[in-house]
């Protein structure tokens, strides 16, 4: 499986940092932010800025859903339940999930909602992104430690590591 489309839910520092990075390498048509209709309207009216550059992100509400190959959760933990519901129309038979919320609770919630076969575990380290209003700044993106709960190497891990290799996103597999 090759990951060609990425949906990101959560427009905090990590969501914007990874979204901007991936959008520049894969194109705005292939990387989009997922949000409820109210947030989409708000996001479209005030463009995000990342390290001084306007992002020009693409946004999709559930009414505008397309199947994503990978969905990245970058919401605060208290927003996970709502996010799990919001992404539902974007989920297909082969959609993979990655959460950049450190700790394993979010992955367990995704597994419960969509099945363990679709979830990779991740921990972001070494980044220094911060957000103030609609501006995100960072000097160091750090890296993502990624893998399966049982430390196996399977097709879903291969698909995501190939994506990271293709885009140059720093990662480690334990």
What is each residue range found by the language model?
Residues 52-135:
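Rossmann-like NAD(P)(H) cofactor-binding subdomain of soluble oxidoreductases
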Residues 9, 13, 87, 156:
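Flavin (primarily FAD) cofactor-binding/catalytic cores of flavoenzymes
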Residues 7, 31-32, 98, 145, ...:
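A structural signal for isolated positions on well-ordered beta-strands in alpha/beta enzyme cores
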Residues 4, 29, 95, 117-118, ...:
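A structural micro-motif
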Residues 90, 116-118, 133-174:
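Internal alpha-helical scaffold of NAD(P)-dependent oxidoreductase catalytic cores
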Residues 39-42, 107-108, 153-154:
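Short, charged/polar "capping" segments at the starts of alpha-helices
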Residues 1-57:
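NAD(P)+-binding Rossmann beta1-loop-alpha1 motif at the extreme N-terminus of oxidoreductases
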